[in-house]
């Protein structure tokens, strides 16, 4: 099966270099996508190295299944199931590096039939795995103004969330909103456009997508699981594309690289004390894209790469 997707990985060299790949190490690509990062890791692995890749998207899984390499294994699953997967593969505490390239992939955004794009018309779906969950169209139809407004405000940081929610429900009372351009045009007519370079529906589409796919919950669960999966000295490298993702990643890294403060006189066992005062992570770096990369790949503009390491 041939798959053609136009995809330029963001900060690919920086991400791969951050892993400090060991030839016979074990690595996990938590967001396979079109395989750009996985293929780079495989190039650096020796004969006894191993790479496991995960992606919830069936098309990404199909692309990965075409890689015929005994060192490589891919599963069609949410990355929140990383810990279960690692247990099944008996690699808990043995992994040298884990990468995440968060957000929507080119597989989803480039194919109008997936319903992610506010620029090209398609069915209003937005599910990263179309076989599970409720579509964006169904959710908007079934939800009330308060629920829609909450999602737009909290997951899209949309200032006009309530105004947009009212407009969506007014249209829904006439007919269900079933296409991406229909939704985009409702939003465009509802709120003022100050920046001609940024589509007024951008934040709302982001918010609905994040909610439909439970992205923030998935990220949080996956991040916590890395602490058990990685070996001492193992690295976690994460590229995020908007402030909600980056805030979550930053908070996770700071929390696990800072010793807890125990109130004086608080009764606590020695085991609990060791657990509370031992840092699990060491923050290595925060990298932003170069201006040259942003010029060549505008999607890189909002990206942030954060790197941390399990304490030896």
Curated annotation (Swiss-Prot):
Record's function text: Specifically methylates the N4 position of cytidine in position 1402 (C1402) of 16S rRNA.
UniProt organism field: Buchnera aphidicola subsp. Acyrthosiphon pisum (strain APS) (Acyrthosiphon pisum symbiotic bacterium)
EC numbers, comma separated: 2.1.1.199
One Pfam family this sequence matches: Methyltransf_5
Name listed for the protein in its UniProt record: Ribosomal RNA small subunit methyltransferase H
Amino acids binding S-adenosyl-L-methionine: 35-37, 55, 79, 101, 108
Biological classification of the source: Bacteria, Pseudomonadati, Pseudomonadota, Gammaproteobacteria, Enterobacterales
GO molecular function, one term: rRNA (cytosine-N4-)-methyltransferase activity
Primary localization: cytoplasm
Gene Ontology CC terms, in alphabetical order: cytoplasm
UniProt keywords, alphabetically: Cytoplasm, Methyltransferase, rRNA processing, S-adenosyl-L-methionine, Transferase
Localization in the cell: Cytoplasm
Catalysed transformations (reactions): cytidine(1402) in 16S rRNA + S-adenosyl-L-methionine = N(4)-methylcytidine(1402) in 16S rRNA + S-adenosyl-L-homocysteine + H(+)
């Amino acid at each position: 099966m041939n798959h053609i997707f136009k995809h330029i990985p963001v900060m690919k060299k920086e991400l791969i270099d951050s892993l400090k790949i060991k030839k016979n190490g074990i690595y996990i690509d938590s967001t396979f996508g079109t395989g750009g990062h996985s293929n780079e890791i495989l190039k650096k692995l020796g004969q006894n190295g191993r790479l496991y890749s995960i992606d919830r998207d069936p098309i990404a899984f199909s692309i990965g299944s075409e890689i015929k390499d005994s060192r490589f294994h891919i599963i069609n699953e949410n990355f929140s199931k990383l810990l279960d997967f690692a247990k099944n593969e008996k690699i808990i505490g043995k992994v040298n590096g884990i990468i995440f390239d968060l957000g929507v992939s080119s597989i989803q955004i480039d194919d109008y039939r997936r319903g992610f794009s506010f620029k090209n018309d398609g069915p209003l779906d937005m599910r990263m795995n179309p076989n599970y969950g409720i579509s964006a169209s169904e959710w908007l139809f079934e939800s009330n103004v308060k629920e829609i407004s909450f999602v737009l405000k909290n997951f899209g940081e949309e200032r006009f969330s309530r105004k947009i929610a009212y407009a969506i429900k007014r249209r829904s009372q006439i007919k269900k909103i079933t296409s991406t351009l229909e939704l985009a045009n409702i939003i465009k007519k509802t709120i003022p456009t100050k920046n001609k370079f940024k589509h007024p529906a951008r934040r709302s589409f982001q918010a609905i997508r994040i909610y439909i796919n439970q992205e923030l919950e998935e990220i949080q669960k996956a991040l916590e699981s890395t602490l058990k999966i990685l070996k001492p000295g193992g690295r976690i490298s994460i590229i995020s594309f908007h402030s909600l993702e980056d805030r979550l990643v930053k908070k996770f890294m700071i929390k696990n690289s800072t010793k807890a403060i125990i109130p004086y006189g608080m009764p606590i066992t020695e085991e609990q004390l060791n657990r509370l005062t031992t840092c699990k992570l060491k923050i290595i770096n925060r990298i932003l894209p170069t201006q040259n990369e942003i010029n060549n790949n505008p999607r890189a503009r909002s990206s942030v790469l954060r790197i941390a390491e399990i304490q030896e």
